[in-house]
Curated annotation (Swiss-Prot):
Domain Ig-like C2-type: 183-266, 271-347, 354-439
PROSITE patterns the UniProt entry points to: IG_LIKE
Gene name of this polypeptide: ALCAM
Cytoplasmic-side positions: 488-521
Subunit structure: Homodimer. Interacts (via extracellular domain) with CD6 (via extracellular domain). Homodimerization and interaction with CD6 involve the same region and cannot occur simultaneously. The affinity for CD6 is much higher than the affinity for self-association. Interacts (via glycosylated extracellular domain) with LGALS1 and LGALS3. Interaction with LGALS1 or LGALS3 inhibits interaction with CD6.
Name this protein carries in UniProt: CD166 antigen
Record carries keyword Coiled coil: no
Main function: Cell adhesion molecule that mediates both heterotypic cell-cell contacts via its interaction with CD6, as well as homotypic cell-cell contacts. Promotes T-cell activation and proliferation via its interactions with CD6. Contributes to the formation and maturation of the immunological synapse via its interactions with CD6. Mediates homotypic interactions with cells that express ALCAM. Mediates attachment of dendritic cells onto endothelial cells via homotypic interaction. Inhibits endothelial cell migration and promotes endothelial tube formation via homotypic interactions.
Compositionally skewed regions (Basic and acidic residues) per UniProt: 507-521
Lineage: Eukaryota, Metazoa, Chordata, Craniata, Vertebrata
Length: 521
């Protein structure tokens, strides 16, 4: 359009004259050195301004071009996709920068590297809009992107490049990281809890996992011997498992049954059968076979206990004795399986009728005699003494402890004449009576040996075994010496026979010679 005068200043007048130009109203200032300032710059101020110097003789002009710049806002990624899918071209988002003048350019970056358009993989759509009022530009760049698994945790950014008074500048956006969806490529199955050994009665949970993102929420579970899968979430629980649950367990994707995983489960078991068991009552001398049978998924250890004391071997009774009575426990366990133990008990009661043996001995002082009634039987027999004849009783019925069905009662007596002592032993099975004649204290008599107690029996047996061993060694030595001596004597006799034979031949020769001489004469 036509030039418009906007300001005038005379060298002779100090005042400034501004023309009536509405768009510059109250925005112009012309200084004494003829510098024109425009406040509150606008895009419309981008024009050609001319400074004119008018003199009496001539007119001088000095034109200049005014450029207006507006820095755009920091770019921002908006309309972001909630996730990206592999092998699918999908809109990632829009990068927008507002209020720019002049307009700028937008660039996308993946992990700091510029994204260049690539058909079917990277699609960029750029557009700009100018506000009709402010004449400022808004730039928008849309990015469509086909993601791969390599884009997991990758940083996407964008920048705007614009021109300012000092040249080209760039402003970066904040980074954006997108969740990458990808299909399951492998299925795995787990057994929970993750202990190594499973026993009967346990609760186990099968957990199926797919390595896709997001992971599958439903699977098909296949139990041993069942061709049809059971549809469930990613877990399937088995309660109170039994030994017949041992086998291969599988799971697969619902929509892709060929993608399957399997695991082998062994349910360990342990059975124990004790025969007989519970409380068993037998008679002394009876035979009692005892068996503890084990059935287990692995080799099991077996321990026998009697009255809380571990036995070296399994009990076997060909002829029951009172000391065989007690509480027997057969216990077994699988060492590799925690908590898998079984035990059965046998309470053995050995009963017997009372048996009595009586002995007597004279006190070294010669003033009293001790009579002992040895009793064995079970239940414990009660002992009762009776005396026939006269005599003074010094100390009556002192009893020993009842051990292994045996005990004894002693009575000390100083009879002035011959007496008979009777010992009666009685339990629920029978009443047994035995008597012993005891001479008067003044009459010496042969003492009978005491019954060997159970505590001393083992020591005596050990000593007897030792003595027998020594005697056998002595006999062996004597036998060897005898054999050597016999061989020596035999050899000596043989030599003697040879000498005698030779001597006899000499004598016979002499006689023959004498006879020959006589014949010749």
């Amino acid at each position: 359009g036509s030039p418009v005068f906007i300001a005038f200043r005379s060298s002779t007048k100090k005042s400034v004259q501004y023309d009536d130009v509405p768009e510059y109203e109250d925005r112009l200032s012309l200084s004494e050195n003829y510098t024109l300032s425009i406040s509150n710059a606008r895009i419309s101020d981008e024009k050609r301004f001319v400074c004119m110097l008018v003199t009496e003789d001539n007119v001088f002009e000095a034109p200049t071009i005014v450029k207006v710049f507006k820095q755009p806002s920091k770019p921002e990624i908006v309309s972001k996709a909630p996730f990206l899918e592999t092998e699918q071209l999908k809109k990632l988002g829009d990068c927008i920068s507002k209020d720019s003048y002049p307009d700028g350019n937008i660039t996308w970056y993946r992990n700091g590297k510029v994204l260049q358009p690539l058909e079917g993989v990277v699609v960029l759509i750029f557009k700009k809009q100018m506000d009709p009022v402010t004449q400022l530009y808004t730039m928008t760049s849309s990015l469509e992107y086909k993601a791969t698994k390599a884009d997991i945790q990758m940083q996407f950014t964008c920048s705007v490049t614009y021109y300012g008074p000092s040249g080209q500048k760039t402003v970066q956006s904040e980074q954006a990281i997108f969740d990458i969806y990808y299909p399951t490529e492998q299925v795995t199955i787990q057994v929970l809890p993750s202990k190594t050994a499973i026993k009967e009665g346990d609760i186990i949970t099968l957990k199926c996992l797919g390595n896709g993102n997001p992971p599958p929420e439903e699977f098909l579970f296949y139990l041993p011997g069942q061709p049809e899968g059971i549809r469930s979430s990613n877990t399937y629980t088995l309660t109170d498992v039994r030994r017949n649950a041992t086998g291969d367990y599988k799971c697969s994707l619902i929509d892709k049954k060929s993608m399957i995983a399997s695991t082998a489960i062994t349910v360990h078991y342990l059975d124990l059968s004790l025969n007989p068991s519970g409380e068993v009552t037998k008679q002394i001398g009876d035979a009692l076979p005892v068996s503890c049978t084990i059935s287990a998924s692995r080799n099991a250890t077996v321990v026998w206990m009697k009255d809380n004391i571990r036995l070296r071997s399994s009990p076997s009774f060909s002829s029951l004795q009172y000391q065989d009575a007690g509480n027997y426990v057969c216990e077994t366990a699988l060492q590799e399986v925690e908590g898998l133990k079984k035990r059965e008990s046998l309470t053995l009661i050995v009963e017997g009728k009372p048996q009595i043996k009586m002995t007597k001995k004279t006190d070294p002082s010669g003033l009293s005699k001790t009579i002992i009634c040895h009793v064995e039987g079970f239940p414990k027999p009660a002992i009762q003494w009776t005396i026939t004849g006269s005599g003074s009783v010094i100390n009556q019925t002192e009893e020993s402890p009842y051990i292994n069905g045996r005990y004894y009662s002693t009575i000390i007596n100083s009879p002035e004449e011959n007496v008979t002592l009777t010992c009666t032993a009685e339990n629920q099975l029978e009443r047994t009576v035995n008597s012993l004649n005891v001479s008067a204290i003044s009459i010496p008599e042969h003492d009978e040996a005491d019954e060997i107690s159970d505590e001393n029996r083992e020591q005596v047996n050990h000593r007897a075994t030792l003595i027998v061993g020594i005697v056998l060694r002595l006999l062996h030595g004597a036998l060897v010496a005898g054999v050597v001596y016999w061989l020596y004597v035999k050899k000596s006799k043989t030599a003697s026979k040879h000498v005698n034979k030779d001597l006899g031949n000499l004598e016979e020769n002499k006689k023959l010679e004498q006879n020959n001489h006589r014949t010749e004469a």
